């Protein structure tokens, strides 16, 4: 038996309220579902990516770099770090530095909500957390259709772009060069 819909505040709309069904998945269910997709894709191809959004742009990182996808966690602040490093979280006893990709890419800051997602990635045997607006999907990319680091004026520096791909709906997906995001002097904060 389905529960009746309720009225809930809609943060993304000019409407004050919208109907929400109890049966709609919440943030925890959506993250759990994506975790299962990530596990399945990691066992398949090296051409699988996890997509996420910042503002209206869609970005993707190689699925092999994804260690974990978690909801917002309490962040311990650190002094004397760049503004895009929000601090560290304790992930099962390991301190993981957290980078807000909006700030790293020069976008305006956004308040964290229950839908904010932390992508935990492993680069050179180090864990790093990336704050993203939301995680969208698992995408299998045909490498022959990737345009390598195009010369265009984008919101982010091209040093963080590995390439650009058009998905099945002809929407542009920006492939992020995860190792390029990490400069050793910026990431020693969690390993002192």
Residue ranges and their predicted role:
Residues 1-192:
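An acidic, low-aromatic, low-complexity terminal/linker signal
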């Amino acid at each position: 038996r389905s529960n009746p819909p309720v009225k809930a505040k809609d943060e993304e709309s000019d409407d004050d309220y919208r109907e929400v069904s109890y049966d709609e998945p919440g943030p925890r269910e959506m993250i759990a579902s994506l975790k299962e997709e990530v596990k399945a894709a990691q066992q398949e191809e090296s051409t699988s990516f996890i997509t996420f959004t910042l503002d209206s742009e869609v970005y993707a990182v190689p699925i092999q770099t994804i260690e974990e996808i978690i909801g917002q966690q309490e962040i311990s602040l650190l002094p004397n770090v760049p503004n895009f490093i929000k601090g560290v979280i304790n992930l099962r006893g390991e301190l993981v530095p957290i980078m807000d990709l909006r700030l790293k890419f020069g976008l305006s800051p956004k308040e964290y909500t229950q839908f904010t997602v932390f992508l935990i990635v492993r680069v050179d045997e180090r864990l790093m957390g990336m704050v993203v607006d939301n995680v969208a999907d698992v995408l299998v990319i045909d490498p022959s259709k990737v345009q390598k680091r195009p010369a265009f004026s984008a919101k982010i520096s091209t040093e963080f772009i590995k390439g650009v791909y058009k998905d099945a709906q002809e929407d542009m997906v920006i492939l992020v060069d995860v190792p390029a995001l990490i400069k050793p002097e910026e990431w020693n904060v969690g390993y002192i």
